[in-house]
Amino acid sequence: MTKKLPSELKQTRKSIQTACEFCHTKHIQCDVGRPCQNCLKRNIGKFCRDKKRKSRKRIEKHGTQPYLNLGKRLVIHDVPSKTVSPSSVHLQRDFLSSDQEKPGKTPAHNTNIQYTYNINDNFQSAGSIPRITNFNTNNGQTVLENTSNNISASQAVHLMNDPIIPTVRKSTLNLKSHFLEQHKAMQQPLATNCLVATSNVPVHSGMDDSNKSDDDVDDETNIHFDSMWCNDEYMKLKDIVDISTPFLPNNSQIFSLQESEYPNPSASTRGNSSLHLTNLLNSTKSVNDQKDSSIGHSTSTFNTYDEVVSRPFISLDMLHLNRGANANTHPSHNAKLESECDSSSHSDADLEKHDTDFISPSKFRELVKTPQDLYDNKCLIKPHNYKLAYTKLLTTLRKKFLEGAEIDKSASVKDEHSTQKHNLRYDLEVIIRSILERYAPIFISLTSNMIEEDLLLQEVTLQRALLDLENMAKLVSCTPMCIWRRSGEICFVSNEFYSLTGFNKNLLLDRTSFIFEYLDHKSVSNYFQIFNELLAFGYNDINKRKKLLMLNACSSTSSKITEGFSFTTDGKAIFTKCNLLLSNGLYLKCACCWTVKRDSFNIPILVMGQFLPIFEMD
Protein backbone atom coordinates (compact mmCIF):
# COMPACT_ATOMS: atom_id res chain seq x y z
CA MET A 1 0.00 0.00 0.00
CA THR A 2 1.30 3.43 -0.94
CA LYS A 3 2.59 5.48 1.95
CA LYS A 4 0.51 8.54 2.71
CA LEU A 5 2.40 11.74 2.00
CA PRO A 6 2.51 14.61 4.52
CA SER A 7 0.66 17.80 3.74
CA GLU A 8 3.88 19.83 3.21
CA LEU A 9 5.10 17.38 0.54
CA LYS A 10 1.71 17.38 -1.12
CA GLN A 11 1.85 21.16 -1.37
CA THR A 12 5.26 21.05 -3.05
CA ARG A 13 4.09 18.42 -5.55
CA LYS A 14 0.97 20.31 -6.48
CA SER A 15 0.78 21.21 -10.16
CA ILE A 16 1.47 24.82 -11.03
CA GLN A 17 0.22 26.79 -14.01
CA THR A 18 3.57 27.58 -15.64
CA ALA A 19 6.83 25.67 -15.18
CA CYS A 20 10.29 26.97 -15.86
CA GLU A 21 12.13 26.14 -19.06
CA PHE A 22 14.44 23.57 -17.43
CA CYS A 23 11.68 21.67 -15.62
CA HIS A 24 9.51 21.78 -18.72
CA THR A 25 12.31 20.27 -20.81
CA LYS A 26 13.21 17.58 -18.24
CA HIS A 27 9.54 16.83 -17.41
CA ILE A 28 10.05 17.22 -13.64
CA GLN A 29 7.88 18.87 -10.98
CA CYS A 30 8.50 22.61 -10.71
CA ASP A 31 7.46 25.01 -7.93
CA VAL A 32 6.20 28.56 -7.88
CA GLY A 33 9.48 30.03 -6.67
CA ARG A 34 11.91 31.71 -9.07
CA PRO A 35 14.47 30.37 -9.16
CA CYS A 36 12.89 27.02 -8.40
CA GLN A 37 14.45 24.37 -6.17
CA ASN A 38 15.48 22.18 -9.12
CA CYS A 39 17.45 25.00 -10.71
CA LEU A 40 19.05 25.94 -7.37
CA LYS A 41 20.26 22.37 -6.83
CA ARG A 42 21.94 22.42 -10.23
CA ASN A 43 23.41 25.93 -9.87
CA ILE A 44 21.46 27.30 -12.80
CA GLY A 45 19.24 29.62 -10.85
CA LYS A 46 20.07 32.65 -12.97
CA PHE A 47 18.64 30.89 -16.03
CA CYS A 48 15.38 29.94 -14.36
CA ARG A 49 12.47 31.65 -16.13
CA ASP A 50 8.92 30.75 -17.07
CA LYS A 51 8.32 28.68 -20.19
CA LYS A 52 6.62 30.77 -22.84
CA ARG A 53 3.64 29.09 -24.42
CA LYS A 54 2.42 29.59 -27.93
CA SER A 55 -0.65 31.73 -28.23
CA ARG A 56 -3.81 29.93 -29.24
CA LYS A 57 -5.45 30.71 -32.54
CA ARG A 58 -9.02 31.45 -31.57
CA ILE A 59 -11.43 30.75 -34.44
CA GLU A 60 -14.98 31.91 -34.14
CA LYS A 61 -17.42 29.16 -34.98
CA HIS A 62 -20.54 31.24 -35.59
CA GLY A 63 -19.40 33.48 -38.40
CA THR A 64 -17.35 36.65 -38.39
CA GLN A 65 -18.29 40.27 -38.62
CA PRO A 66 -17.37 41.89 -41.90
CA TYR A 67 -14.18 43.84 -41.68
CA LEU A 68 -14.59 47.60 -41.70
CA ASN A 69 -12.48 49.81 -43.92
CA LEU A 70 -11.01 46.72 -45.57
CA GLY A 71 -9.46 47.10 -49.02
CA LYS A 72 -8.39 44.19 -51.13
CA ARG A 73 -6.62 43.82 -54.37
CA LEU A 74 -6.90 40.61 -56.34
CA VAL A 75 -3.89 40.19 -58.59
CA ILE A 76 -3.82 37.38 -61.08
CA HIS A 77 -0.94 37.35 -63.55
CA ASP A 78 -1.47 38.42 -67.18
CA VAL A 79 -2.09 35.68 -69.78
CA PRO A 80 -1.13 36.65 -73.31
CA SER A 81 -2.56 33.38 -74.62
CA LYS A 82 -5.92 31.72 -74.03
CA THR A 83 -4.96 29.60 -71.07
CA VAL A 84 -4.88 30.12 -67.31
CA SER A 85 -3.14 27.93 -64.78
CA PRO A 86 -5.83 26.70 -62.38
CA SER A 87 -3.49 25.03 -59.93
CA SER A 88 -1.93 28.27 -58.72
CA VAL A 89 -3.54 31.71 -58.44
CA HIS A 90 -1.52 34.39 -56.70
CA LEU A 91 -3.49 36.74 -54.51
CA GLN A 92 -2.13 39.93 -53.02
CA ARG A 93 -4.22 41.55 -50.28
CA ASP A 94 -3.68 44.96 -48.78
CA PHE A 95 -5.20 45.00 -45.29
CA LEU A 96 -5.99 48.48 -44.07
CA SER A 97 -6.60 49.49 -40.47
CA SER A 98 -9.57 47.72 -38.89
CA ASP A 99 -11.76 48.59 -35.90
CA GLN A 100 -11.70 45.00 -34.71
CA GLU A 101 -8.18 44.90 -33.38
CA LYS A 102 -7.08 42.86 -30.40
CA PRO A 103 -6.77 44.72 -27.09
CA GLY A 104 -3.30 45.80 -26.14
CA LYS A 105 -2.21 46.33 -29.73
CA THR A 106 -2.15 49.51 -31.72
CA PRO A 107 -4.11 49.63 -34.93
CA ALA A 108 -2.02 47.98 -37.57
CA HIS A 109 -0.87 49.95 -40.56
CA ASN A 110 -1.14 48.80 -44.13
CA THR A 111 0.34 45.33 -44.37
CA ASN A 112 1.13 43.61 -47.68
CA ILE A 113 0.52 39.87 -47.53
CA GLN A 114 1.13 37.64 -50.56
CA TYR A 115 0.20 34.01 -50.57
CA THR A 116 -0.80 31.19 -52.90
CA TYR A 117 -3.84 29.00 -52.63
CA ASN A 118 -5.26 26.14 -54.65
CA ILE A 119 -8.63 26.66 -56.28
CA ASN A 120 -9.67 23.18 -55.22
CA ASP A 121 -9.12 23.97 -51.52
CA ASN A 122 -12.02 24.52 -49.15
CA PHE A 123 -13.13 28.13 -49.03
CA GLN A 124 -15.03 27.81 -45.76
CA SER A 125 -12.36 29.55 -43.72
CA ALA A 126 -11.79 32.34 -46.24
CA GLY A 127 -14.98 34.23 -45.67
CA SER A 128 -13.88 37.48 -47.23
CA ILE A 129 -11.82 36.20 -50.15
CA PRO A 130 -13.36 36.90 -53.58
CA ARG A 131 -13.83 33.68 -55.48
CA ILE A 132 -13.41 33.10 -59.20
CA THR A 133 -16.47 31.20 -60.37
CA ASN A 134 -15.84 30.94 -64.08
CA PHE A 135 -12.90 30.88 -66.48
CA ASN A 136 -14.07 31.97 -69.90
CA THR A 137 -11.51 31.76 -72.68
CA ASN A 138 -13.84 32.58 -75.56
CA ASN A 139 -12.17 34.78 -78.22
CA GLY A 140 -9.05 35.17 -76.15
CA GLN A 141 -10.80 36.90 -73.24
CA THR A 142 -10.67 35.79 -69.64
CA VAL A 143 -13.81 36.79 -67.75
CA LEU A 144 -13.78 36.49 -63.99
CA GLU A 145 -17.14 36.35 -62.23
CA ASN A 146 -17.14 37.54 -58.65
CA THR A 147 -19.81 36.39 -56.25
CA SER A 148 -19.78 39.73 -54.44
CA ASN A 149 -22.67 42.12 -55.09
CA ASN A 150 -20.48 45.22 -54.90
CA ILE A 151 -18.03 45.32 -57.78
CA SER A 152 -15.55 48.08 -58.40
CA ALA A 153 -15.17 48.37 -62.17
CA SER A 154 -12.59 51.14 -62.04
CA GLN A 155 -9.87 48.90 -60.67
CA ALA A 156 -8.14 46.21 -62.65
CA VAL A 157 -7.03 42.64 -62.21
CA HIS A 158 -3.77 41.84 -63.98
CA LEU A 159 -3.54 38.40 -65.53
CA MET A 160 -0.21 36.80 -66.25
CA ASN A 161 0.66 33.14 -66.67
CA ASP A 162 3.05 31.45 -64.28
CA PRO A 163 5.86 30.04 -66.50
CA ILE A 164 6.72 27.36 -63.97
CA ILE A 165 3.31 25.74 -63.76
CA PRO A 166 2.06 24.25 -67.06
CA THR A 167 -1.02 25.87 -68.51
CA VAL A 168 -4.32 24.05 -68.87
CA ARG A 169 -6.77 24.52 -71.68
CA LYS A 170 -10.38 25.61 -71.60
CA SER A 171 -11.83 22.16 -71.08
CA THR A 172 -9.90 21.79 -67.85
CA LEU A 173 -10.63 25.27 -66.55
CA ASN A 174 -14.42 25.29 -66.56
CA LEU A 175 -15.12 24.40 -62.96
CA LYS A 176 -18.13 26.65 -62.64
CA SER A 177 -20.44 24.08 -61.16
CA HIS A 178 -17.80 23.04 -58.64
CA PHE A 179 -17.45 26.60 -57.36
CA LEU A 180 -21.20 27.16 -57.31
CA GLU A 181 -21.66 24.14 -55.07
CA GLN A 182 -19.11 25.56 -52.67
CA HIS A 183 -20.80 28.95 -52.82
CA LYS A 184 -24.10 27.44 -51.65
CA ALA A 185 -22.36 26.02 -48.59
CA MET A 186 -20.79 29.32 -47.64
CA GLN A 187 -22.81 31.48 -45.25
CA GLN A 188 -20.32 34.27 -44.80
CA PRO A 189 -20.60 37.74 -46.36
CA LEU A 190 -18.05 38.76 -48.90
CA ALA A 191 -15.98 41.91 -48.63
CA THR A 192 -16.72 44.91 -50.74
CA ASN A 193 -14.51 46.83 -53.13
CA CYS A 194 -13.21 43.70 -54.90
CA LEU A 195 -11.23 44.29 -58.04
CA VAL A 196 -12.34 42.04 -60.85
CA ALA A 197 -11.89 44.03 -64.06
CA THR A 198 -9.44 42.46 -66.50
CA SER A 199 -6.65 44.56 -67.94
CA ASN A 200 -4.68 42.16 -70.12
CA VAL A 201 -7.27 42.34 -72.90
CA PRO A 202 -9.84 45.04 -73.70
CA VAL A 203 -13.26 44.03 -72.42
CA HIS A 204 -15.77 44.51 -75.21
CA SER A 205 -19.12 45.70 -73.98
CA GLY A 206 -20.99 44.29 -76.92
CA MET A 207 -20.33 40.65 -76.24
CA ASP A 208 -22.58 38.29 -78.18
CA ASP A 209 -25.09 36.15 -76.38
CA SER A 210 -23.97 33.22 -78.46
CA ASN A 211 -20.65 33.22 -76.70
CA LYS A 212 -22.37 32.92 -73.34
CA SER A 213 -24.51 30.06 -74.54
CA ASP A 214 -21.44 28.26 -75.83
CA ASP A 215 -19.79 28.63 -72.43
CA ASP A 216 -22.84 27.20 -70.69
CA VAL A 217 -22.85 24.20 -72.99
CA ASP A 218 -19.16 23.70 -72.43
CA ASP A 219 -19.66 23.85 -68.68
CA GLU A 220 -22.28 21.12 -68.84
CA THR A 221 -20.00 18.80 -70.80
CA ASN A 222 -17.23 18.92 -68.20
CA ILE A 223 -16.56 15.99 -65.93
CA HIS A 224 -16.56 16.70 -62.20
CA PHE A 225 -15.64 14.33 -59.42
CA ASP A 226 -16.59 14.36 -55.77
CA SER A 227 -12.92 14.35 -54.77
CA MET A 228 -10.74 17.37 -55.36
CA TRP A 229 -7.75 15.04 -55.83
CA CYS A 230 -9.55 13.32 -58.69
CA ASN A 231 -10.32 16.70 -60.23
CA ASP A 232 -6.68 17.73 -59.97
CA GLU A 233 -5.48 14.47 -61.51
CA TYR A 234 -8.02 14.75 -64.30
CA MET A 235 -6.88 18.28 -65.06
CA LYS A 236 -3.25 17.15 -65.26
CA LEU A 237 -4.12 14.35 -67.67
CA LYS A 238 -6.13 16.74 -69.83
CA ASP A 239 -3.18 19.12 -69.75
CA ILE A 240 -0.89 16.41 -71.12
CA VAL A 241 -3.29 15.51 -73.92
CA ASP A 242 -4.04 19.12 -74.90
CA ILE A 243 -0.47 20.38 -74.92
CA SER A 244 0.78 17.37 -76.89
CA THR A 245 -0.92 18.47 -80.14
CA PRO A 246 -0.62 22.26 -80.49
CA PHE A 247 -1.97 23.78 -83.72
CA LEU A 248 -3.22 20.33 -84.80
CA PRO A 249 -6.73 20.70 -86.25
CA ASN A 250 -9.50 18.22 -85.72
CA ASN A 251 -10.76 15.73 -88.25
CA SER A 252 -13.76 17.81 -89.27
CA GLN A 253 -11.51 20.69 -90.31
CA ILE A 254 -9.24 18.31 -92.17
CA PHE A 255 -12.02 16.71 -94.18
CA SER A 256 -13.82 19.99 -94.86
CA LEU A 257 -10.68 21.68 -96.14
CA GLN A 258 -9.70 18.63 -98.12
CA GLU A 259 -13.07 18.47 -99.87
CA SER A 260 -13.02 22.19 -100.60
CA GLU A 261 -9.57 22.12 -102.17
CA TYR A 262 -9.94 18.81 -103.99
CA PRO A 263 -13.37 18.40 -105.60
CA ASN A 264 -12.25 15.18 -107.25
CA PRO A 265 -12.61 12.43 -104.62
CA SER A 266 -9.90 10.25 -106.15
CA ALA A 267 -7.43 13.10 -105.98
CA SER A 268 -8.48 14.28 -102.54
CA THR A 269 -8.11 11.00 -100.70
CA ARG A 270 -4.40 10.55 -101.29
CA GLY A 271 -3.07 13.35 -103.42
CA ASN A 272 -1.49 16.54 -102.15
CA SER A 273 -1.79 15.40 -98.55
CA SER A 274 1.34 17.19 -97.48
CA LEU A 275 0.21 20.40 -99.14
CA HIS A 276 -3.15 19.93 -97.50
CA LEU A 277 -1.50 19.62 -94.08
CA THR A 278 0.67 22.67 -94.76
CA ASN A 279 -2.29 24.75 -95.89
CA LEU A 280 -4.27 23.65 -92.88
CA LEU A 281 -1.51 24.58 -90.46
CA ASN A 282 -1.00 27.93 -92.16
CA SER A 283 -4.73 28.66 -92.10
CA THR A 284 -4.87 27.76 -88.43
CA LYS A 285 -1.99 30.09 -87.68
CA SER A 286 -3.57 32.90 -89.72
CA VAL A 287 -6.80 32.56 -87.74
CA ASN A 288 -4.83 32.74 -84.51
CA ASP A 289 -3.03 35.85 -85.77
CA GLN A 290 -6.36 37.50 -86.57
CA LYS A 291 -7.65 36.73 -83.09
CA ASP A 292 -4.51 38.11 -81.53
CA SER A 293 -4.78 41.32 -83.54
CA SER A 294 -8.46 41.70 -82.65
CA ILE A 295 -7.77 41.62 -78.93
CA GLY A 296 -4.81 43.95 -79.11
CA HIS A 297 -1.89 41.52 -79.08
CA SER A 298 0.80 41.47 -81.70
CA THR A 299 2.53 38.45 -83.14
CA SER A 300 5.74 39.39 -81.37
CA THR A 301 3.97 39.23 -78.02
CA PHE A 302 2.64 35.79 -78.88
CA ASN A 303 6.09 34.55 -79.85
CA THR A 304 7.58 36.01 -76.67
CA TYR A 305 5.00 34.19 -74.59
CA ASP A 306 5.76 31.01 -76.54
CA GLU A 307 9.41 31.27 -75.58
CA VAL A 308 8.58 31.83 -71.90
CA VAL A 309 5.97 29.12 -71.44
CA SER A 310 7.48 26.39 -73.64
CA ARG A 311 9.87 23.97 -71.98
CA PRO A 312 13.40 25.26 -72.61
CA PHE A 313 15.03 21.84 -72.77
CA ILE A 314 12.35 19.37 -73.92
CA SER A 315 10.26 20.18 -76.95
CA LEU A 316 8.65 18.56 -79.95
CA ASP A 317 8.07 21.86 -81.73
CA MET A 318 7.95 20.32 -85.20
CA LEU A 319 4.90 22.10 -86.55
CA HIS A 320 6.15 25.58 -85.60
CA LEU A 321 8.89 25.52 -88.26
CA ASN A 322 8.44 28.28 -90.84
CA ARG A 323 4.96 28.97 -89.50
CA GLY A 324 5.31 32.72 -89.73
CA ALA A 325 6.55 32.82 -93.31
CA ASN A 326 3.36 31.57 -94.94
CA ALA A 327 0.80 32.72 -92.39
CA ASN A 328 -0.89 35.50 -94.33
CA THR A 329 -0.21 34.42 -97.91
CA HIS A 330 -2.24 32.11 -100.10
CA PRO A 331 -0.18 31.31 -103.23
CA SER A 332 -0.90 28.52 -105.62
CA HIS A 333 0.27 24.95 -105.07
CA ASN A 334 3.27 25.28 -107.37
CA ALA A 335 4.34 28.52 -105.70
CA LYS A 336 4.07 26.82 -102.30
CA LEU A 337 6.23 23.97 -103.50
CA GLU A 338 8.87 26.39 -104.72
CA SER A 339 8.78 28.29 -101.44
CA GLU A 340 9.15 25.01 -99.52
CA CYS A 341 12.18 24.03 -101.57
CA ASP A 342 13.73 27.48 -101.07
CA SER A 343 13.05 27.44 -97.34
CA SER A 344 14.49 23.94 -97.01
CA SER A 345 17.65 24.98 -98.84
CA HIS A 346 18.17 27.99 -96.56
CA SER A 347 17.11 26.19 -93.40
CA ASP A 348 20.32 24.17 -93.19
CA ALA A 349 22.40 27.34 -93.01
CA ASP A 350 20.09 28.81 -90.38
CA LEU A 351 20.20 25.65 -88.30
CA GLU A 352 23.99 25.54 -88.36
CA LYS A 353 24.10 29.05 -86.86
CA HIS A 354 22.10 27.87 -83.85
CA ASP A 355 24.15 24.66 -83.59
CA THR A 356 27.36 26.24 -82.31
CA ASP A 357 27.74 23.77 -79.43
CA PHE A 358 27.42 20.71 -81.65
CA ILE A 359 30.23 18.16 -81.40
CA SER A 360 30.25 15.49 -84.07
CA PRO A 361 30.28 11.85 -82.91
CA SER A 362 33.72 11.27 -84.42
CA LYS A 363 35.29 14.24 -82.58
CA PHE A 364 33.61 13.27 -79.33
CA ARG A 365 34.94 9.72 -79.63
CA GLU A 366 38.47 11.08 -80.05
CA LEU A 367 38.14 12.76 -76.64
CA VAL A 368 36.20 10.02 -74.85
CA LYS A 369 37.38 6.48 -75.53
CA THR A 370 36.88 4.80 -72.15
CA PRO A 371 34.36 5.17 -69.31
CA GLN A 372 37.01 6.91 -67.22
CA ASP A 373 37.52 9.49 -69.98
CA LEU A 374 33.78 10.08 -69.94
CA TYR A 375 33.77 11.12 -66.28
CA ASP A 376 37.05 13.03 -66.56
CA ASN A 377 35.63 15.13 -69.43
CA LYS A 378 32.17 15.44 -67.92
CA CYS A 379 32.38 19.22 -68.23
CA LEU A 380 32.21 18.86 -72.02
CA ILE A 381 28.88 17.05 -71.90
CA LYS A 382 25.76 19.15 -72.23
CA PRO A 383 22.08 18.20 -72.61
CA HIS A 384 21.40 17.33 -76.21
CA ASN A 385 19.31 19.85 -78.13
CA TYR A 386 16.51 17.56 -79.30
CA LYS A 387 14.40 20.51 -80.39
CA LEU A 388 16.99 21.41 -83.01
CA ALA A 389 17.39 17.73 -83.87
CA TYR A 390 13.70 17.30 -84.61
CA THR A 391 13.74 20.48 -86.67
CA LYS A 392 16.57 19.06 -88.77
CA LEU A 393 14.72 15.76 -88.97
CA LEU A 394 11.64 17.47 -90.38
CA THR A 395 13.81 19.23 -92.97
CA THR A 396 15.40 15.90 -93.92
CA LEU A 397 12.04 14.20 -94.27
CA ARG A 398 10.74 17.04 -96.42
CA LYS A 399 13.72 16.72 -98.73
CA LYS A 400 13.32 12.96 -98.91
CA PHE A 401 9.56 12.87 -99.50
CA LEU A 402 8.92 16.17 -101.29
CA GLU A 403 12.09 16.75 -103.33
CA GLY A 404 11.19 17.31 -106.95
CA ALA A 405 7.56 16.29 -106.34
CA GLU A 406 5.95 19.07 -108.37
CA ILE A 407 2.33 18.40 -109.23
CA ASP A 408 1.05 18.83 -112.78
CA LYS A 409 -2.65 19.56 -112.62
CA SER A 410 -3.11 18.71 -116.30
CA ALA A 411 -1.58 15.27 -115.88
CA SER A 412 -3.82 12.24 -115.71
CA VAL A 413 -4.75 10.85 -112.29
CA LYS A 414 -3.93 7.36 -113.50
CA ASP A 415 -0.33 8.30 -114.11
CA GLU A 416 1.82 5.99 -112.01
CA HIS A 417 4.53 8.56 -111.38
CA SER A 418 2.04 11.15 -110.18
CA THR A 419 0.32 8.62 -107.93
CA GLN A 420 3.63 7.70 -106.36
CA LYS A 421 4.33 11.34 -105.54
CA HIS A 422 0.89 11.70 -103.99
CA ASN A 423 1.57 8.64 -101.85
CA LEU A 424 4.90 10.06 -100.68
CA ARG A 425 3.20 13.25 -99.57
CA TYR A 426 0.59 11.25 -97.73
CA ASP A 427 3.31 9.16 -96.08
CA LEU A 428 4.97 12.30 -94.74
CA GLU A 429 1.68 13.39 -93.22
CA VAL A 430 1.26 9.94 -91.65
CA ILE A 431 4.75 10.15 -90.12
CA ILE A 432 4.06 13.56 -88.57
CA ARG A 433 0.71 12.41 -87.23
CA SER A 434 2.31 9.27 -85.80
CA ILE A 435 4.78 11.39 -83.86
CA LEU A 436 2.19 13.86 -82.58
CA GLU A 437 -0.63 11.44 -81.75
CA ARG A 438 1.22 8.36 -80.44
CA TYR A 439 4.73 9.36 -79.39
CA ALA A 440 4.39 12.94 -78.13
CA PRO A 441 1.67 12.47 -75.44
CA ILE A 442 3.53 9.67 -73.65
CA PHE A 443 6.86 11.43 -74.04
CA ILE A 444 5.54 14.67 -72.53
CA SER A 445 3.94 12.81 -69.62
CA LEU A 446 7.26 11.12 -68.80
CA THR A 447 9.36 14.28 -69.11
CA SER A 448 6.98 16.77 -67.48
CA ASN A 449 8.91 16.77 -64.18
CA MET A 450 12.44 16.61 -65.59
CA ILE A 451 14.90 19.44 -65.01
CA GLU A 452 18.15 20.38 -66.71
CA GLU A 453 20.20 18.19 -64.37
CA ASP A 454 18.05 15.20 -65.32
CA LEU A 455 18.74 15.88 -68.98
CA LEU A 456 22.45 16.11 -68.26
CA LEU A 457 22.28 12.78 -66.44
CA GLN A 458 20.37 11.34 -69.39
CA GLU A 459 23.12 12.43 -71.79
CA VAL A 460 25.82 10.90 -69.57
CA THR A 461 23.80 7.68 -69.43
CA LEU A 462 23.52 7.72 -73.22
CA GLN A 463 27.25 8.13 -73.73
CA ARG A 464 28.01 5.42 -71.17
CA ALA A 465 25.60 3.00 -72.84
CA LEU A 466 27.05 3.91 -76.23
CA LEU A 467 30.52 2.86 -75.08
CA ASP A 468 29.18 -0.54 -74.01
CA LEU A 469 27.38 -1.03 -77.31
CA GLU A 470 30.49 -0.10 -79.26
CA ASN A 471 32.51 -2.66 -77.32
CA MET A 472 29.85 -5.25 -78.05
CA ALA A 473 30.03 -4.36 -81.75
CA LYS A 474 33.73 -5.18 -81.72
CA LEU A 475 33.00 -8.61 -80.28
CA VAL A 476 30.16 -9.33 -82.71
CA SER A 477 32.18 -8.30 -85.74
CA CYS A 478 30.14 -10.22 -88.30
CA THR A 479 26.95 -8.14 -88.12
CA PRO A 480 26.60 -4.70 -89.75
CA MET A 481 25.46 -2.40 -86.99
CA CYS A 482 24.32 1.20 -86.68
CA ILE A 483 23.31 3.08 -83.49
CA TRP A 484 21.24 6.25 -83.47
CA ARG A 485 19.36 8.47 -81.01
CA ARG A 486 15.59 8.51 -80.60
CA SER A 487 15.55 11.45 -83.01
CA GLY A 488 17.35 9.37 -85.66
CA GLU A 489 20.80 11.00 -85.38
CA ILE A 490 23.53 8.44 -86.05
CA CYS A 491 26.01 8.02 -83.18
CA PHE A 492 27.99 4.92 -84.20
CA VAL A 493 28.50 2.85 -87.34
CA SER A 494 30.43 -0.42 -87.42
CA ASN A 495 33.02 -1.26 -90.04
CA GLU A 496 30.80 -4.02 -91.43
CA PHE A 497 28.09 -1.44 -92.09
CA TYR A 498 30.58 0.64 -94.08
CA SER A 499 31.58 -2.43 -96.05
CA LEU A 500 27.96 -3.36 -96.74
CA THR A 501 26.78 0.06 -97.90
CA GLY A 502 30.02 1.44 -99.33
CA PHE A 503 29.75 4.83 -97.64
CA ASN A 504 32.69 6.70 -96.14
CA LYS A 505 33.04 7.00 -92.37
CA ASN A 506 33.57 10.76 -92.50
CA LEU A 507 30.31 11.18 -94.41
CA LEU A 508 28.26 9.62 -91.64
CA LEU A 509 29.93 10.72 -88.39
CA ASP A 510 31.49 14.10 -89.16
CA ARG A 511 28.10 15.78 -89.51
CA THR A 512 24.53 15.42 -88.31
CA SER A 513 23.26 12.47 -90.34
CA PHE A 514 20.01 10.57 -89.84
CA ILE A 515 19.40 6.87 -90.32
CA PHE A 516 16.35 7.76 -92.42
CA GLU A 517 18.64 9.13 -95.13
CA TYR A 518 19.82 5.56 -95.79
CA LEU A 519 16.38 3.89 -95.89
CA ASP A 520 13.74 4.00 -98.58
CA HIS A 521 10.38 5.70 -98.13
CA LYS A 522 8.49 2.56 -97.21
CA SER A 523 11.06 1.56 -94.59
CA VAL A 524 11.00 5.05 -93.05
CA SER A 525 7.21 5.02 -92.78
CA ASN A 526 7.24 1.52 -91.26
CA TYR A 527 9.93 2.51 -88.77
CA PHE A 528 8.06 5.53 -87.42
CA GLN A 529 4.78 3.67 -87.00
CA ILE A 530 6.40 0.64 -85.34
CA PHE A 531 8.72 2.73 -83.16
CA ASN A 532 6.06 5.17 -81.96
CA GLU A 533 3.48 2.47 -81.27
CA LEU A 534 5.54 -0.46 -79.93
CA LEU A 535 9.25 0.10 -79.54
CA ALA A 536 9.57 3.52 -77.90
CA PHE A 537 7.90 2.86 -74.54
CA GLY A 538 7.25 -0.89 -74.62
CA TYR A 539 3.97 -2.76 -74.69
CA ASN A 540 2.00 -5.10 -72.46
CA ASP A 541 -0.08 -7.29 -74.77
CA ILE A 542 1.81 -8.22 -77.93
CA ASN A 543 -1.14 -9.52 -79.91
CA LYS A 544 -3.35 -6.59 -78.94
CA ARG A 545 -0.69 -4.10 -79.90
CA LYS A 546 -0.03 -5.83 -83.19
CA LYS A 547 -3.72 -5.82 -84.12
CA LEU A 548 -3.98 -2.16 -83.16
CA LEU A 549 -0.95 -1.33 -85.25
CA MET A 550 -2.34 -3.16 -88.27
CA LEU A 551 -5.68 -1.38 -87.93
CA ASN A 552 -3.99 2.01 -87.71
CA ALA A 553 -1.90 1.30 -90.80
CA CYS A 554 -2.74 3.59 -93.68
CA SER A 555 -4.41 2.40 -96.83
CA SER A 556 -1.64 3.77 -99.02
CA THR A 557 0.41 1.00 -100.60
CA SER A 558 3.70 2.76 -99.98
CA SER A 559 3.05 3.37 -96.27
CA LYS A 560 1.28 0.13 -95.37
CA ILE A 561 3.12 -1.75 -92.64
CA THR A 562 4.48 -5.09 -93.69
CA GLU A 563 3.15 -8.10 -91.81
CA GLY A 564 6.57 -9.72 -91.54
CA PHE A 565 7.69 -8.44 -88.15
CA SER A 566 7.92 -10.09 -84.74
CA PHE A 567 8.55 -9.02 -81.15
CA THR A 568 10.55 -10.00 -78.13
CA THR A 569 8.88 -10.71 -74.81
CA ASP A 570 10.58 -7.83 -72.99
CA GLY A 571 9.42 -5.28 -75.56
CA LYS A 572 12.90 -3.99 -76.36
CA ALA A 573 13.49 -5.45 -79.84
CA ILE A 574 11.54 -5.90 -83.06
CA PHE A 575 12.52 -8.01 -86.08
CA THR A 576 11.41 -6.81 -89.49
CA LYS A 577 12.63 -6.04 -93.01
CA CYS A 578 13.87 -2.86 -94.63
CA ASN A 579 15.59 -1.57 -97.76
CA LEU A 580 19.06 -0.13 -97.12
CA LEU A 581 20.58 2.50 -99.39
CA LEU A 582 23.93 1.71 -101.01
CA SER A 583 26.59 4.12 -102.21
CA ASN A 584 25.69 3.43 -105.86
CA GLY A 585 22.11 4.66 -105.32
CA LEU A 586 20.46 1.22 -105.23
CA TYR A 587 18.62 -0.35 -102.32
CA LEU A 588 19.50 -3.66 -100.69
CA LYS A 589 16.79 -5.72 -99.01
CA CYS A 590 17.84 -6.58 -95.46
CA ALA A 591 16.48 -8.35 -92.41
CA CYS A 592 16.94 -5.98 -89.50
CA CYS A 593 16.62 -6.00 -85.73
CA TRP A 594 15.82 -2.77 -83.91
CA THR A 595 16.73 -2.79 -80.20
CA VAL A 596 15.90 0.15 -77.93
CA LYS A 597 17.87 1.31 -74.89
CA ARG A 598 15.89 3.27 -72.28
CA ASP A 599 16.96 5.29 -69.25
CA SER A 600 15.61 5.22 -65.70
CA PHE A 601 12.61 7.34 -66.75
CA ASN A 602 11.64 4.71 -69.36
CA ILE A 603 12.50 7.21 -72.10
CA PRO A 604 14.21 5.80 -75.22
CA ILE A 605 17.70 7.20 -75.63
CA LEU A 606 19.37 4.87 -78.16
CA VAL A 607 18.25 2.50 -80.89
CA MET A 608 20.61 -0.17 -82.20
CA GLY A 609 19.95 -1.51 -85.68
CA GLN A 610 21.51 -4.72 -86.99
CA PHE A 611 21.21 -5.49 -90.69
CA LEU A 612 21.67 -8.75 -92.57
CA PRO A 613 21.36 -8.67 -96.39
CA ILE A 614 18.79 -10.90 -98.09
CA PHE A 615 19.99 -12.23 -101.44
CA GLU A 616 17.09 -13.54 -103.46
CA MET A 617 17.84 -16.42 -105.81
CA ASP A 618 16.51 -16.17 -109.34
Curated annotation (Swiss-Prot):
Database matches in Pfam families: PAS_13, Zn_clus
- The residue ranges marked as DNA-binding region are 20-48
Q: Does the keyword Nucleotide-binding apply?
A: no
Q: Which PROSITE patterns match?
A: ZN2_CY6_FUNGAL_1 (PS00463), ZN2_CY6_FUNGAL_2 (PS50048)
Name the segments for region: Disordered: 325-352
Print the organism lineage: Eukaryota, Fungi, Dikarya, Ascomycota, Saccharomycotina
Q: Which GO terms describe its cellular component?
A: nucleus
InterPro entries named among the record's database cross-references = ERT1_acuK_gluconeogen_tf, PAS_13, Zn2-C6_fun-type_DNA-bd_sf, Zn2Cys6_DnaBD
Q: What's an example Gene Ontology biological process for this entry?
A: cellular response to starvation
Briefly state the protein's biological role: Transcription factor which regulates nonfermentable carbon utilization. Binds specifically to 5'-CGGN(8)CGG-3' and 5'-CGGN(9)CGG-3' sequences in the promoter region.
Q: What protein name applies here?
A: Glucose starvation modulator protein 1
Is Transcription found in the keyword set?
yes
PAS domain location is: 466-538
Q: Which GO terms describe its molecular function?
A: DNA-binding transcription factor activity, RNA polymerase II-specific; RNA polymerase II transcription regulatory region sequence-specific DNA binding; zinc ion binding
Q: Where is the composition biased (Basic and acidic residues)?
A: 335-352
